[in-house]
From Swiss-Prot:
InterPro entries: Adenylat/UMP-CMP_kin, Adenylat_kinase_CS, P-loop_NTPase. The gene is adk. It comes from the Bacteria. ATP binds at residues 12-17, 127, 168. Pathway: Purine metabolism; AMP biosynthesis via salvage pathway; AMP from ADP: step 1/1. It comes from Prochlorococcus marinus subsp. pastoris (strain CCMP1986 / NIES-2087 / MED4). This is Adenylate kinase. It catalyses: AMP + ATP = 2 ADP. Residues 32-61 are annotated as: NMP. AMP binds at residues 33, 38, 59-61, 85-88, 92, 129, 140.
């Protein structure tokens, strides 16, 4: 079974939910960049102190710093891993590829959670986070389409991409992911 996976998709597509379900079922590390950054801050590590300082200034954490934190977690003994929310752009893809080659853990499947914008907007509004209003959601989708969507073609060209219809119910989406993993 494939053990080195990546979940791509727009905000609210269900990446974190599906990655968590799959990692729990297979004892894989679930590496969500947001959670990894918060963990470093909570543990008060040197990296965490840098991240906290950057975030307190309202700035974005650099690609290099995020990569260091991801690499630190990939280096651990594991039964496999799932990346969720990283990489987000082609520059990050290239840096990640170098790390994965170095640790001999190549990416094996990229699941693209495909969902129509109107379904996504409705889902996010129902979710009800305080930053989930229609204007903010549309801005996040625009940024996603500009920076992250090009990764879909990149991974498709490498024959790593599996398209998952993500506008269905949780069980149907999970079953589709498991079925596509079994066929690889």
């Amino acid at each position: 079974m494939k053990k080195h996976l990546l979940f791509l998709g727009p905000p609210g597509a269900g990446k974190g939910t599906q990655a968590a379900l799959l990692s729990a079922a297979n004892s894989y590390l679930h590496l969500s960049t947001g959670e990894l950054l918060r963990k470093e801050i909570d543990l008060d590590t040197d990296l965490g102190k840098q991240v906290k300082d950057i975030m307190n200034r309202g700035e974005l954490v650099s690609d290099q710093l995020v990569l260091e934190i991801v690499k630190k977690n990939l280096d651990k003994d594991n039964n496999g891993w799932i990346l969720d929310g990283y990489p987000r752009n082609l520059s990050q893809v290239n840096s990640l590829n170098d790390v994965l080659i170095n640790i001999n853990q190549p990416l094996e499947i990229v699941f693209y959670l495909d969902i129509p914008d109107e379904v996504l907007i409705k889902r996010l509004l129902i979710r009800g986070r305080k930053d989930d209003n229609e204007k903010t959601i549309k801005t996040r989708l625009k940024i996603y389409k500009e920076t992250t969507e090009p990764l879909i073609e990149y991974y498709k060209d490498l024959a790593l991409l599996e398209n998952i219809k993500a506008d269905g119910d949780l069980k149907t989406i999970s079953a589709d992911i498991k079925q596509k993993m079994a066929c690889r």
